[in-house]
């Protein structure tokens, strides 16, 4: 489900997305999109996922969320029935006792801390589950709601396939905005001039084309309405005119125009497996990576579903490596001459080889389709031996670097590190990913997050890991960082860890390597599902 927008404005700390004539604004709240009009008396609408049950016609998940809201003292947030329990109600459960709708604004991420609710949604009673409902694709000026939220374990980075019966993508005509949201949007349109229709000077609410997949089109027009109340002059309030449904026929809001597109492929679907993991096939995928992913036009024989998948893969490449390849990642020491797309393919191969979440099978299908479309006189057996050696070296070094930083983090948790008078500055990226590595390391060695740890000790661990990440990301070998840590600790443990991991092979799964893959998956998907949302500092364009 896609919502095009023309400009963005940061107002009261929240990003608002305006349509072309600035007659309507969208904002994100608890994984849902809320649309408000400039025109007095216009329609307010909410677009997003509602929770259902574990099978067709079942509403057990919705009932559970409503009962938990009542139990935790958030009766004011309980929806009137089981048909309109939106994802933002789920977000409220993990947002703290005093949380209101205003606290949920600005992100498509919804935290699920309740293992019972997680069991309903992904069939596993996990904690620290995050549901990613959509993404802001800034380079296309589009907000996208996924057909089904993506479920990620924030502790280890694992992705789960949610129960599709648990979610439906719908829209609802809102009768009012909650009080906290009324305060948020008050005065929003005052600083943004309306652009009138140049042909007839009309200031009517323009149509917004909302693009949905065929699956979503079946449910997106589900419309929740309530009884009539008197009309008032207060915008966005509970006295907003309420429109009674006059028949069983579902009608859309007057600003909505639905356009249907083919269903977008889930490139991370674990049921879609690669047909081979031979190095020669990998080399072919790496060789054609940029043409396959970045080529603007479809080539003959490319299926629509695969063509749509290219856009999703491109977005993931940008999330991991940046628009111009400016974001560092593992494997840089040997992969300097490879493009971001080529290094991305290698990462997907490693994840696929170790049966973690990946999109290598889709890349394989795209490569096969592209090669089949080449002229018959083209020499497709053109992968140089130097490139094959570079691919092998990059894959092995990438897994070894990830393995070393992971085992180092696990070891540092039990070592008494000397305190430093001051800390050198490390990059924001290394700090953020250092925290993620340490969180996963604690889980790996059986340390609970509830065990109290001195803040200075935690900061010390985070500093060492983030500093070492900066060293690796700059292209320095693991060995140099291990030697520095040996001097710092007065111990040979870091160099011993280095020699334990240096023999790892990315092409032959082994027991210790599975722990390394957990770290790789956590860091990779941490970027894929966070970077596209930006840094929250958007300004009007």
Swiss-Prot record:
InterPro entries, alphabetized: Herpes_UL21
A matching Pfam family: Herpes_UL21
Source taxon at top rank: Viruses
Keyword hit for Methyltransferase: no
Location in the cell: Virion tegument; Host cytoplasm; Host nucleus
Keyword ATP-binding: no
GO cellular component: host cell cytoplasm; host cell nucleus; viral tegument
Keywords: Host cytoplasm, Host nucleus, Virion, Virion tegument
Function according to Swiss-Prot or TrEMBL: May participate in DNA packaging/capsid maturation events. Promotes efficient incorporation of tegument proteins UL46, UL49, and US3 homologs into virions. May also play a role in capsid transport to the trans-Golgi network (TGN).
Subunit comment: Interacts (via C-terminus) with UL16.
Similarity comment text for this entry: Belongs to the alphaherpesvirinae UL21 protein family.
Name of the protein described by the UniProt record: Tegument protein UL21 homolog
Organism: Varicella-zoster virus (strain Dumas) (HHV-3)
